[in-house]
Structures are given as C-alpha cells and as structure tokens.
Amino acid sequence: MIIIPARLASTRFPRKVLHPINGIPMIIHTAQRASQVDEVVIATDSEEVMKIAKQYGFDAVLTSKTHESGTDRVNEAATLLGLDAKEIIINVQADEPLIEPQVIKKVKELTIKHTKSCEIMLCSAYKKISFDATNDPNSVKVVLDASDKALYFSRSQIPYPRSDVKTINIHLGIYGYTKEMLQKFCTLPTAPLEQIEKLEQLRALYHGYRIAMVEVTSQSIGIDTPEDLKKINASFFE
C-alpha cells in the first residue's frame, strides 16, 4: 500500500498540496502517478483535502493536526486502516508531483527484499547529479557504503571535495517499510543529528538501524517553495 501524507498548513508554502498544476491539485498528480504501482491512501489533517481526494476517486483518512512529521502521519493512518504488521507501506511525499511510478516500484521491490531483516529499518532511493548543482540545502545528500546502505544524510555537500568530484547522491523523498518497522521508528527518541539537520531518517541511523538505498533515474523534484514550481515544465502534465 502507498500512503501519501498531506499536511495543509505547510510553513514555507501554505496549502501547497492543493496548489493547482494544469488545473489539478498537486497531491492528485502525485496520487495518480503512485496509483500506477499500488493502492493509494491519502493521510491528511484537512477535511478539505479529504473531500478533494474523494472527488478524484482516492481513499483518504483524517489524521491528527499535531504530527511533527509525515512519517508520524503515515503511522497513524496505517493504524486507522488496521494494516497487518508485515504489510509493506510506501510513503510517497505529497509534494512530488513528478514522481515516476518506476521509482516507487523500485523502492517497493527493495522493501520486499528486506522484509525479514531486523537491521534494515527502512528503504529509500537516490539519484546521481552533477556535484556543481548541489548547493541547495533542500536537496538532501546521502553517502553510501559498498552495499548501498546509507552512512549519512545531510543538507550540506557530502562528501567534502578535497579532490575532483563529478557527481553526488541526492536522496529522494520516498520511504518503504513494514508497518512493524514503521511503528518501531515512530517510538524511537528523536536524535540530536535529526534535530540539527531536520532530517528524520537520521533517527534510524543514530539508533543503530540501517537504511537500504536503491539508485534510480528520476526527473522528480520536491516542491518546497513557490519558486520550485517554476522548475516544473508544464508539458509533463499534458
């Protein structure tokens, strides 16, 4: 199952999940792409988002307004839906209207592969881009070990380029886990590194769990600010 967390009152871009792109709300673009891979449920704190989701034929559940992260919202939704402990859940960010179904599929396949692992808490994806294009702190960087497990995530440029570096790994905002591991993640204490970087995935690494990564090819960008919308080619939605 794919669960899309959708908070209406975004700090940097209020009501962004309902912002129209070619006349269709952003979250609906995301949901339509995700629905090519698996069943989609939208988890939101807004009756308005609930109504719009249903108008476009998507199931939605109403969750608390007090959640500090999308993962907490997904966790509540999974509980409300009564999902089994071993159910595979893919968390797709609402502000990824360009997310390719193939990216979601790869993360789902990786999550299934690690379902029985006690050390892999979650799975995610990354893409390689030019090192010169990584100054934006909203583009989260990830360094990996030899088996594509995450060593660290940062908003800074990592690794530091003491020598010539042509490409760097950019983390994509998608997560896969079992409901059991999702619940475990949400019960872990917030980590100091997580608070510094404002990256919740660092919580898993801090507490000794591992994050499995898969390389993908993707043109998707997360919409964090109104300026990000200018980067989107409207023809993608035609």
UniProtKB/Swiss-Prot annotation:
Catalyzed reaction equations: 3-deoxy-alpha-D-manno-oct-2-ulosonate + CTP = CMP-3-deoxy-beta-D-manno-octulosonate + diphosphate
Keywords, alphabetical: Cytoplasm, Lipopolysaccharide biosynthesis, Nucleotidyltransferase, Transferase
Broadest EC class assigned to this enzyme: transferase
One Gene Ontology MF term: 3-deoxy-manno-octulosonate cytidylyltransferase activity
Pathway(s) it belongs to: Nucleotide-sugar biosynthesis; CMP-3-deoxy-D-manno-octulosonate biosynthesis; CMP-3-deoxy-D-manno-octulosonate from 3-deoxy-D-manno-octulosonate and CTP: step 1/1; Bacterial outer membrane biogenesis; lipopolysaccharide biosynthesis
Gene3D superfamilies named in the record: Spore Coat Polysaccharide Biosynthesis Protein SpsA, Chain A
Compartment(s): Cytoplasm
Disulfide partners: none
Broad class of where this protein is predominantly found: cytoplasm
Entry's EC annotation: 2.7.7.38
InterPro entries listed in its UniProt record: Cytidylyl_trans, KdsB, Nucleotide-diphossugar_trans
Domain of life the protein comes from: Bacteria
Pfam families: CTP_transf_3
One annotated GO biological process: CMP-keto-3-deoxy-D-manno-octulosonic acid biosynthetic process
GO CC annotations on file: cytosol
UniProt family annotation: Belongs to the KdsB family.
Function: Activates KDO (a required 8-carbon sugar) for incorporation into bacterial lipopolysaccharide in Gram-negative bacteria.
The name this protein goes by in its record: 3-deoxy-manno-octulosonate cytidylyltransferase
Natural source organism: Nitratiruptor sp. (strain SB155-2)
Gene: kdsB
